């Protein structure tokens, strides 16, 4: 019985061991299944992450920069960057083409000696976003509500996108993505535009100042070098920079010339008599030595001497400039009293490859808009409102206003010629064709150039001073890794 009992006991133990082993094997199988499941999930997560990263979706929703407590996504940063770059390309197409630069080669080319175009666009994007959020944050913090004019401007801009999308027979989101090059929805675009519009409206209606004639006069007196012009004459005596004897002889000739000058006419006569062989043609003319209307806002050896506040008519000086000695005769310094004009316009664009029929359609549309304005109140304010609704120019939000236009303004000739026509009267209208399309014009008035320039400078000074305070209140931080991935 003992042996049999032991056998049964052993068999029971063996069965228990087998059961335990089977349970252990089941546990291992369950663990392997669980681990396999986790691995599959991890692979899927990595695949999704990789897909989001590869398509840029992840980066676009990461924070690219902050302004105070506001977070700017990579997508929004990309929108601002692309729009700034696109506007620069379209505005400077002729210049860039003459420099042999294209959209694909532009970013690595030098904008200045120390900055590439790509770095310039990045800098401008940072600044634009910062200002937009600073003004928006101030508006919301102070409980500001959009003005009626601001709301109308915003609505007009949104409607312009909707109309353009409808005309192109595509969705609004698709249109925006085509124009901006960013995966942005209409809803996201409206939010960006609203922030920008509310901030600008807040500043213009609560912070911007209006200046009196006395304000402008005082600003001019304090900053005359920014606005004054000067007339002077220059006679140059060249030398070989590597030949000391040549340099000494040139200095002696220049000093003798200066010492012999008694008045402006003597300067003219001596320049003609002492001209080097290659200067005879230039200095034989009475105006060969003359510089008129030189802007004192610039700098240089001659200009720095001319704009010295102690300078008086008849002053003569010999100045060394590179490889010549320049004898300079001061004639006059004066405020620019020439007239500059203010105009409003509505741009209806014409594509470059448009045929005559397409151009005629746009011209007809321009004529109809002008007649619509004439049939209404026909005031400058009503014209400005029409510009906000219909103009494709970048200044549409300002009612199509351009100020301070004069002969030196870099505008298309046909546009500038209409503005500067001496017969022009306040309230005059017309239609001007340029390479950009048809412009419906409104002449708003004229005033002395110095006054227009002083108001613009004073406005900018006050605006920049305000932004300096905002920069302290809303510090900016950039996430360079995200930015580099989205631009």
Name the predicted role of every residue range.
Residues 160-171, 228-229, 276-285, 393-400:
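Secretory-pathway/luminal and periplasmic proteins that interact with or process carbohydrate-rich
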